[in-house]
């Protein structure tokens, strides 16, 4: 097949794909006049396949809404076994490449050339994937407007500098929320994205239930179920008061963050049963293990860096610190959001006490919970 750009054959998951053979760099990638493909996003597609294979109810039809090479939809067809997968992209070169990739994987599917918002006016699917180059916001209103009862939406956001606090004014303009550049920036950004999704669903008299949400590399990813229901009490503002501790706040409060989603980032009934597939990478399996360990933990976390600065003690080994919190009856685990972060339900005074006791530079006495 003749295409106006060079191509190369690659394998990803269960799929064999023809993709543009163009220079690549780390991070979100570089757009060009060719269908976009970023191999580092394989982790995204690995976790999508695992989530959709364990979705709370059967999914009859899936839409790869901004399909590019068709990698997401083809992998879902092969790995999830969806009965019907459709593809949409506004580029004719992209839809030609998608058809070739379908042929290579011995699949048949509907392939449409056009704008996603127009496509969604005419067609409905059980799950719509929105994975753009750039922010997802231009496509989300149409996606939520078209969402059927108990349908799902998967959203990838690569505008992490905006959501995670580097450009707070851009975040307020784009998502209607104030972020915070901090160790917790990725979790805050993910919760802002979910809060934005909640607002779009609420405008249609519906609510969202996050099934699986995470941060990885240079992107944020959410999978949500859209259900009927009244406004959620999971939306609020918070303010940071000390290392890893945030409390509810009014949107008018100085330093207030949000509005953002404060409910679970995933459905524990689903997440705790997820297992890597035969096609999952080592990186995906490692990420999934962390997501399972923290899926029932409260929002936000502290890092040993923050605690070391606050307590003026050298940090203990992370695993020993977690063990110390567990020994006095609290839940504690690593978090995928930060390599030195700890999620726990311990109050701040006990977090600090255990940290000081286990610090290699000194001890402050016993570590019984504070009364």
PLM ranges: what are they?
Residues 1-371:
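SAM-dependent transferase fold signal centered on methyltransferase-like domains
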């Amino acid at each position: 097949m003749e295409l106006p750009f060079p191509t190369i054959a690659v394998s990803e998951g269960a799929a064999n794909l023809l993709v543009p053979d163009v220079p690549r760099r780390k991070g979100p990638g570089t757009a060009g006049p060719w269908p976009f493909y970023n191999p580092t996003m394989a982790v995204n597609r690995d976790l999508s396949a695992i989530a959709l294979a364990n979705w709370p109810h059967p999914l009859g039809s899936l839409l790869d809404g901004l399909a590019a090479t068709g990698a997401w939809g083809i992998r879902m067809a092969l790995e999830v076994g969806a009965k019907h997968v459709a593809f949409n992209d506004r580029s004719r070169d992209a839809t030609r490449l998608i058809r070739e990739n379908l042929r290579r994987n011995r699949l048949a599917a509907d392939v449409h050339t056009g704008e996603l918002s127009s496509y969604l006016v005419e067609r409905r699917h059980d799950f719509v994937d929105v994975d753009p180059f750039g922010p997802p916001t231009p496509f989300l209103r149409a996606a939520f407007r078209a969402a059927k009862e108990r349908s799902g939406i998967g959203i990838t956001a690569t505008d992490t500098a905006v959501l995670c606090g580097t450009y707070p004014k851009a975040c307020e303009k784009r998502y209607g929320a104030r972020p915070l550049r901090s160790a917790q920036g990725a979790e805050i950004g993910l919760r802002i994205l979910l809060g934005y999704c909640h607002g779009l669903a609420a405008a249609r008299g519906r609510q969202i239930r996050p099934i699986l949400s995470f941060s990885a590399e240079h992107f944020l990813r959410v999978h949500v179920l859209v259900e009927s229901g009244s406004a959620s009490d999971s939306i609020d503002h918070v303010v940071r008061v000390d290392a890893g501790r945030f409390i509810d706040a009014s949107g008018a409060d100085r330093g207030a963050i949000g509005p953002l989603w404060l409910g679970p980032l995933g459905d524990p009934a689903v997440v705790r049963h997820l297992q890597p597939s035969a096609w999952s990478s080592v990186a995906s399996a490692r990420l999934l293990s962390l997501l399972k360990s923290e899926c029932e933990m409260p929002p936000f976390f502290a890092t040993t860096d923050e605690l070391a600065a606050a307590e003026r003690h050298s940090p203990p080994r992370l695993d020993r610190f977690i063990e110390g919190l567990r020994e006095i009856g609290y839940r504690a685990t690593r978090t995928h959001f930060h390599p030195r972060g700890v999620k726990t339900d311990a109050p701040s005074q006990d977090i600090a006490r255990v940290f000081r006791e286990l610090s290699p530079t000194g001890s402050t006495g016993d570590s019984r919970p504070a009364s």
